[in-house]
């Protein structure tokens, strides 16, 4: 694929009492759109936000060779803050001042490693905005996440703690 620039919209959501989470990503490639989604149990909101970004970047890395420049749009201040905290976290070996591992250390390290393959422009968008042409994809990933969390929460049995990936191609 000759395309070297793409835009990705990500979101994550979690039912805090049940610890059931979902993540979604929309990858825009020229006139094509790829949707990635997944659900996870025993998780947190921040882990879902991170997972959405990681799964999207992993997809790009494995399925879209030649893509280097990524415009990554998220409403997560947590995700947006990670690039600028990288040096400090690495210098502290990903531990807190008390010597404990930082929250989500596994996913943070995975995100940093994946980020090395790309030039990523992390863009913060306000959550839950009214629909306009600029934010339709942010609304789409938000709705996908909330729907999956509701569906998982309504089921009495959640089958696996592993993330389940599904891909929809086209519009």
PLM feature spans:
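Short, surface-exposed recognition loops or helix-turn segments adjacent to catalytic cores
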Residues: 124-129, 156-163
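RNase H-like nuclease fold core
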Residues: 1-47, 51, 58-61, 83, ...
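RNase H catalytic domain
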Residues: 13-19, 54-137
């Amino acid at each position: 694929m000759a395309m070297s620039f793409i835009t990705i919209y990500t979101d994550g959501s979690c039912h805090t009492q049940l610890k059931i989470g979902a993540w979604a990503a929309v990858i825009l490639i020229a006139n094509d759109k790829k949707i990635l989604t997944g659900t996870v149990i025993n998780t947190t909101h921040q882990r879902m936000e991170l997972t959405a970004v990681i799964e999207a970047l992993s997809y790009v890395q494995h399925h879209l060779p030649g893509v280097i420049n990524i415009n990554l749009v998220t409403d997560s201040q947590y995700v947006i803050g990670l690039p600028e905290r990288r040096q400090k976290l690495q210098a502290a070996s990903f531990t807190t001042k008390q010597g404990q591992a930082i929250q989500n250390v596994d996913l943070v390290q995975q995100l940093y490693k994946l980020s090395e393959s790309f030039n990523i422009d992390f863009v913060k968008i306000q959550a839950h905005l009214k629909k306009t042409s600029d934010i339709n994809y942010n609304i789409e990933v938000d709705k996908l996440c909330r729907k999956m969390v509701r569906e998982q929460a309504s089921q009495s049995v959640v089958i696996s703690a592993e993330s389940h990936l599904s891909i929809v191609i086209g519009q």
